[in-house]
Amino acid sequence: MKSAVETLNPTRVRLTVEVPFEELKDSLDAAYKKINQQVTVKGFRKGKIPARVIDQRFGRGAVLEEAVNDALPKFYTDAVNEAELNPLGQPEVDITELKDGETLNFTAEVDIRPSIEIPDYSGIEVEVDAVEVTDEDVEKSVEQLRERFASTSPVERAAADGDVLTLDLQAKVDGEILEDGVADGVSYTIGSGELLDGIDEAVKGLEAGGEATFTSELKGGSAAGKEAEVTVKVSQVAARELPELDDDFAQLASEFDTLEELQADSRKRLANMKQYDQATQAQERVLDKLLELVEVPVPEKLLEDEINTRKHNLEHHQLGQMGLDLEKYLELQGKTAEEFETETREAAVKGIKTQFVLDELVKQEKLNVSQEELTEHLMRRAASSGMSPDQFAQAVVEQGQVPLLVGEVARGKALAAVVEKATVKDTNGEIVDLDDEEDEETEAAEADATEAADAEKADDKAEEKTEG
């Protein structure tokens, strides 16, 4: 076999392959064997029909077609390996010449990973938010905890802000009661904003047994997005009573003996959260700076696939669970269809570029992934998906996604290596030492790498089709 490569553009090549006919022998033998098992010829046992009889009865062309279909993937793969290409997706194959007994010639056009040069990135500088926990932050945190321990007691008076009501609801659209628009015994706190727009105004001033009707746009269910006439009946009004902020409350709501200890712990927890946010912010901003330094051409077909994947996931998974369609979602977001298309395309481009650049860094820095690192990443992914580590690991193995997880960890390490060499300052002008936030930094880096892995999954699916 002889092959040559023609570069069509930075992300696409054309392979020209010439195969001497004798190299088709194994595929021809397999073709005759396959046809032998599929046909019956009088006078011959099944599977024992001579090749010349098959040629006479069914045509040499049918045999050649079967042999070529069997041989093409192998010769294509050999040509790719010989040229040391990194193909993306399925090739477009064209058989240019097939002469029985002489030669098989074909071309294959395919997208490839572009060649990327990573420049010196040690001079990257970014600014992040300072980690500052104010007294107001601590007060708000403790107050939220206090709210969780509030008690309620029924009262015989008109409902007011902060009261907890027990409600019966009924929604009509075009005069018809919705099957999923009836709910009894619903608990609702006035001012929480957890139910329908307009409900606070409708129930304020009502006592137990009171009833009101108002119009509101439904947020979910079979008539999501439609205007409905909602009838609400108050069956109980209860006042909320907050516990006193003292040592007794600290003992009730935590493992601490004093309110001072509880407040100190809240301050520490808030600082840890802000440090994680700071590490995430540093990762994202360093990544943006890195992408600005590197010229990364993006294959158009890969980009189209990534855009379609993102749209599909949004419409059929996220919005589907919320009972929304894309049109209603854009309305709630205050975006036009054109703005959505632009944002989706930009996010897809960034995801693909991120994957290409970080993968190149993994090779350049010779980064490896240990079993311990992979296990830790798997456990984080399991927690974020709401699955047990064992369930998640089993699903990953069954779906053949272990290499994807390895890639996510490796890319996370590559990005962490770039951040380590970058200068990170907070808004106060102070140098941020991310070594003190190693765990947060690693998790943030792997989150970015996981986002970038969407494109790789699309690549792998396409490559599976090619190999098949």
Swiss-Prot record:
Residues 454-468 have a biased composition (Basic and acidic residues). Its EC number is 5.2.1.8. It catalyses: [protein]-peptidylproline (omega=180) = [protein]-peptidylproline (omega=0). GO terms for molecular function: peptidyl-prolyl cis-trans isomerase activity; protein folding chaperone; ribosome binding. Residues 162-243 form the PPIase FKBP-type domain. Involved in protein export. Acts as a chaperone by maintaining the newly synthesized protein in an open conformation. Functions as a peptidyl-prolyl cis-trans isomerase. Belongs to the FKBP-type PPIase family. Tig subfamily. This is Trigger factor. It comes from Streptomyces coelicolor (strain ATCC BAA-471 / A3(2) / M145).
